[in-house]
Amino acid sequence: MGEPPPNPDPSQTRRASQGSERARSQEYSQPLLTIPEDGLNRPPPQRGSRSSQGSQDLQGTGLPHWPQRSSLVPDVQGDEGTEYHQSMPLGYTPGFPMEFSQQGYLDDSRMMEQFPQGQDLLEQLESTYQGSASGILGQLNLYPREDEIFSQDTQHGPYLRDDPSLHLRPSDLGFMPIVGEVPDPEPRELAIQNAKAYLLRTSMSCNLSLYEHLVNLLTKILNQRPEDPLSILESLNRTMQWEWFHPKLDTLRDDPEMQPTYEMAEKQKALFIRGGGEGEQEMEEEVTDSPVPNIMETAFYFEQAGVGLSSDESFRIFLALKQLVEQQPIHMCRFWGKILGLSRSYLVAEVEFREGEEEGEEEEVEEMMEGGEVLETHGEEEGEEDEEKVVDSVPKPQWKPPPIIPKEESRSGTNKYLYFVCNEPGRPWTRLPHVTPAQIVCARKIKKFFTGFLDTPVISYPPFPGNEANYLRAQIARISAATHISPLGFYQFGEEEGDEEEEGGAGRDSFEENPDFEGIPVLELVDSMANWVHHTQHILPQGRCTWVNPLQKTEEEEELGEEEEKADEAMEEVEQEVGPPLLTPLSEDAEIMHLSPWTTRLSCSLSPQYSVAIVRSNLWPGAYAYATGKKFENIYIGWGHKYSPENFNPMLPALIQQEYPSGPEITEMSDPTVEEEQALKAAQEQALAAAEEEEEDEEEEEDEDLED
C-alpha cells in the first residue's frame, strides 16, 4: 500500500476548511454546523486505521455516536466539487465509479467540524433533509435516495467496512447544490453491471462462464428441492461441471420431442371431457340406456380375488369403452380382457352391432374377394397360353391342396361377436377382421408372442395365413370358446327353437337369460363344477363351430369334367365332427395329464357368507370368472398361450414330394455286358438274314406269277 502522505499543516487545513465553510454559507440557506474548537488541534488519523478508533474518540468526547460509514464522498461535480477533488487523500477519482475506487477517511479535525454544538446530530440531519426535500431538488431527483431504499423497517447488516453502500455522502447531510442536470446512474447499478460482466467472462479452459455455472446450479437446486442443499452443494457443483465437460453422445435414434408419458396424458385428456349442450334429462337417459358395462363394479369383485387391473387403469378403460360406444353403432359392449405383448399390450372389447349396421362392411369385403378371384383366373389363362408355347411341358404334381373350409357368417359361430382392440386407453380402437377356419387350425399348431403391432407378420411353420391381427383374432376365439362360463341356470334355451338339431350336428347355437334365476350359493359354486356351464360354442377340429362337408360340391364345381369327378370319388369320405353342445357343465371337461382343467376357491375363507366364488382356468392361464348372487363375469389377462404339460414342439416339415412321376420314359437302364452285346449282334444278324430270305422268296413268287 505504501506510506501514507505527509499530514498537511494544521493551520493551513484550518484556514482551508474555514474558507470552504464561508463559501457554502453564502450558497445555502441552511444553517451551518458549528465545529468545536478543541477538535481543530487533533492530528488527522493515518490511512488504513480502523473505524473503531474513531468511534472510541467520539465516545470519549461525549458526543453522539457517528455511524460507521466508510467516507464522506461528494456525488456532484462542479465548482464546489473541485474542492473535494483537490483533496486526493480521500481516494476518489473523477469519472470512475465510487465503488471501485479506494476510499479514504476524513481526519478527526474534518469529522469534528461536522458535529453540532448543543444539538443532537440526528435532529439536525432530519431538519436539514426536510428542508432540502421541499425545494426544487426534490422535483429534479430522478433516482431514489438511499434512505428511501433502506427504510427503517428493513434490517441491515452486517456489512463490510468498505461496502460502497455504507458511504456517507454529503448529500445525506444536506450539502447538495441545486443543479439542473440529470444525475448519473447510481453507483450501485454500475457496480451490478460491472460485476455481472465480470462473471460472464468465459473460462480460459472452456467456453463456460461462472455466471452460467451458478445459474445452472441454482436452477438444479430449486428444481430438486433437496432437504439439506448446503451439505450436497459440493457434490452438485462437481456434477454440474461433469455434465458440461461430458456432453451426451450422439445416438442412433433422435430423442423424442415429447416423452411418451406426456404424449399419452395429452391423448387421455379427451376421455375426461364431457359433451356440452346436453340437459340433465338427456344425460339420465344416456346413463340408463348406454351399453357401456360397469367396469368399476367388475374390477371391485375381481380385486377381492386378487385378479384384475388397478383402479386407475380400470376407470380409464371404462372411459375408453364409453368413447367406443359413442363412435360405433354398438348394441352390446363388454370388456373382454387384456392380452400382454412384448412391446405393447392389447385391450380387447367384445361388442355386438345393432341389426343392419354390419351389412355395408360385409359387402365391401366380398367385393375385394371377388376382385382377387378375377385376378387369379386371369393369371391362369396366361399360364395356359405359355404352356402351349413350351414344347416340353413340366409334369404336374400329384399333390392337391385340401379343400378350403368357408368361414362362418357374421353373428354366428366363431364370428358371433366383433372385437375392437387398442394399446392404451385414449388411443384409437381398431376393429379386428373375422376369423377363418384355416387361421384357427394353424393357430393351434404354433405358439407366438404378441408384439403389440397389428400389422406385424407372423413368421412360423406351418405358415400362418395372415398377420398379427388375424392371429390375435384366432386366439381370442379359442380362449372365448374354452373359458367363458356362467352359473348353471343363468341362461336357458328359447322355446321357439325346439329340440331340432342343425345339419352340422352342433345343436342349438343361441340362448337367452333366465328371468327366474335366483342365484346359487357361493359354497355350492365352489364345491361342485357341475354348477358351472359353458355358454360359448365349442370349436371343432375343422375350425368352425358348425361342421361343413368339404367335399360337398357347389354349382360351379358340378360343371367340371369327368376326370375330376373320378378323382373325387376315389377320395375317402370325411367323417362328421361333433362337439359338446351349449350349456355343458364343466364337470364333463377332459383332464390335462390327470390335472383338473378348473380350480375354484373363495375370495375370503374367513367370511364365506360375504365371499365371492372364483374359478380359474388351468388350460388357459389368465382366464378367471366370478359369481355372487345373480352377478357373474369373465375376464382374461395373460399372454394368449394355452397351457401345455410338455415343452412346445413345433410341427416338423412335411416329407419331400417327388418332382416327376416314375416311369419307363425317364428310367435309366443298366449297360449290357460284352456277351450280351455279342448275343444281341448275332440275333440281329440272324434277323437280317431271315428278312433277306423272306424278301427273296417273295420276289421269286411274284416272278412266277407274272410268267403264268
Curated annotation (Swiss-Prot):
Q: What is its main location?
A: cytoplasm
- Show the segment(s) annotated as Disordered: 1-94, 376-407, 495-514, 663-708
- GO CC terms for this protein? axoneme; radial spoke; radial spoke head; sperm flagellum
Please list the tissues where expression of this protein has been recorded.
Answer: Expressed in sperm and testis (at protein level).
Question: What Gene Ontology biological process does one annotation of this record name?
Answer: flagellated sperm motility
Where is this protein found?
Answer: Cytoplasm, Cytoskeleton, Flagellum axoneme
What does the PTM comment of the record read? Phosphorylated by PKA. Phosphorylation increases in capacitated sperm.
Quote the InterPro entries the UniProt record gives.
Radial_spoke
Q: Where is the composition biased (Low complexity)?
A: 47-56, 680-690
Biased composition (Polar residues) is annotated at 10-32
According to the record, what happens upon gene knockout?
Answer: Male mutant mice are infertile. Mutant spermatozoa exhibit shorter tails, misshapen heads and immotility. Manchette removal is impaired.
**UniProt entry keywords in alphabetical sequence:** Cell projection, Cilium, Cytoplasm, Cytoskeleton, Flagellum
Q: Which PANTHER family match?
A: RADIAL SPOKE HEAD PROTEIN 6 HOMOLOG A, RADIAL SPOKEHEAD-RELATED
Instruction: Spell out the family assignment given in the record's similarity comment.
Output: Belongs to the flagellar radial spoke RSP4/6 family.
Subunit record text: Component of the axonemal radial spoke 1 (RS1) and 2 (RS2) complexes, at least composed of spoke head proteins RSPH1, RSPH3, RSPH9 and the cilia-specific component RSPH4A or sperm-specific component RSPH6A, spoke stalk proteins RSPH14, DNAJB13, DYDC1, ROPN1L and NME5, and the RS1 complex-specific anchor protein IQUB. Interacts with RSPH1. Interacts with RSPH3B. Interacts with RSPH4A. Interacts with RSPH9. Interacts with RSPH10B.
Function, as annotated, reads:
Functions as part of radial spoke complexes in the axoneme of sperm flagella that play an important part in motility. The triple radial spokes (RS1, RS2 and RS3) are required to modulate beating of the sperm flagellum.
Record protein name field: Radial spoke head protein 6 homolog A
Tell me what organism the protein belongs to: Mus musculus
Q: Gene behind this chain?
A: Rsph6a
